[in-house]
Amino acid sequence: MQQAIEQTSINGALRFNGIGKVFPGVKALSDISFEARPGSVHALMGENGAGKSTLLKILGGSYQPNSGTLQIGEQSYQFKSTAESIAAGVAVIHQELHLVPEMTVAENLLLGHMPNRFGLINRGAMYRRAGELLKGLADEIDPRTRLGDLSLGQRQLVEIAKAMSRNAHVIAFDEPTSSLSAREIDRLMAIIVRLRDEGRVILYVSHRMEEIFRVCDAVTVFKDGRFVKTFEQMADLDHDRLVTCMVGRDIQNIYNYRPRQHQGPSLRVTGLLGPGLHEPVSFAVEKGEVLGFFGLVGAGRTELFRLLSGLTRSTAGTLQLDGKPLTLKSPRDSIEAGILLCPEDRKKEGIVPLSSVAENINIGARPRHVNLGCLIQGRWERDNARSQIKSMNVKTPSPEQQIMFLSGGNQQKAILGRWLSMPMKVLLLDEPTRGIDVGAKSEIYEIIHNLAADGIAVIVVSSDLMEVMGISDRILVMSEGAITGELNRDEADESRLLQLALPRTRS
């Protein structure tokens, strides 16, 4: 029987009691039990695929558990829908925000609860109410603004204000800072502390260790869909202990760096200009070299990669590959030349979500085998997919599993497997480990170093200072669409890189 759920102002703890969830061929969660206290920020940690997001979807009513119950205060629940979860005082703020870009901020905030008069929406009252909800949270946002015109950080604040409008006692954040600037992250941290101090239960999922130690009061660790341990006091934890608990092994050197012999010139860029580049860009990378690009948001690194992969057209400059002139008019030109891109936004640009893992791996490889005949082509694709899944250690119940159900780390490894099916000379990796857990990061770093050892020129864009210093042979720094410095591995440190990355005063 479906239980009646009413709007609650319960101020009790959130308890998960024996939660289990099974998908076809996969046991996503097994007997999860722990408690998150009011007035605390409780982190959920674990490798990709550990079950954190599945648990939040059960909390939010998107998934129904096969076993177990939720408890808020003294009331037990088994949510059958998101509406039931919301009515119980729960708000889940997902990585992909559930807002309508074409509507105004006010319409998004009050969707389903708009004030009306004589059967018509009372827009004056709607804007006033929206302004009240934004006050102290995002005072600079005009409720009349179209939501799609806001920055991602501002949209996230609107999502939080929406949760507040429903008097949410339990608020869960799923990777909330993955695409935010440093200033937006600072603002979000302050808001989370404020929500905690108001006595709410805050669940926080992030792969960024510095955020966990900055804002969280307790940590629960998951592995392979199972509860591992809850640390009730952050004083009991340090970075190494938490990583070991998450991955089940001690990772001494996550970056796996080892010196390599470079094998001669690969790609040379001279005087390149195009959208997002404000000064001519020139650099060269050698075969077997890992070249890092560091910079702050808006530095022009992603725009440079779009030019090098043929996604946008240059307005000036020349390219040489293996000493020969190269002209890129389209992504096909780049792929045929052996310059392959793993994009920053893998969900939108890197994968076909509704297609299988095998189909995603074989997308790039098909043009080389169109004349094999249907039977041989099909056999080759099956064998290639299985081979890449094995070599990349992609965790999937089957090659036919839709790739959208894989963790971020496994999606990234599948994309790398796609390019390994093709002739490759230069690999462009744009934020390759964003939103990926420590264990999967270590695997991707190992793949990068193995490719370099095979003579591939690997160019990595990363906003993670430790990462770019840890894996690169040489680092170029960009700021405001220009290269501002070059450092060899042994001379790079955080201070020098940040100084080069800061915007310059233009005359």
From Swiss-Prot:
Q: Which reaction does it catalyse?
A: L-arabinose(out) + ATP + H2O = L-arabinose(in) + ADP + phosphate + H(+)
Short name of one Pfam family for this protein?
ABC_tran
What one GO molecular function would you report for this record? ABC-type L-arabinose transporter activity
Q: Where is the signal peptide?
A: none
Give the UniProt subcellular location, in the record's own words.
Answer: Cell inner membrane
Membrane topology annotation? Peripheral membrane protein
Gene Ontology CC: plasma membrane
InterPro entries, per this entry?
A: AAA+_ATPase, ABC_carbohydrate_import_ATPase, ABC_transporter-like_ATP-bd, ABC_transporter-like_CS, P-loop_NTPase
Q: How is this protein named in the record? A: Arabinose import ATP-binding protein AraG
- Species of provenance: Pseudomonas savastanoi pv. phaseolicola (strain 1448A / Race 6)
Q: What is the lineage of its organism?
A: Bacteria, Pseudomonadati, Pseudomonadota, Gammaproteobacteria, Pseudomonadales
Q: Which gene encodes it?
A: araG
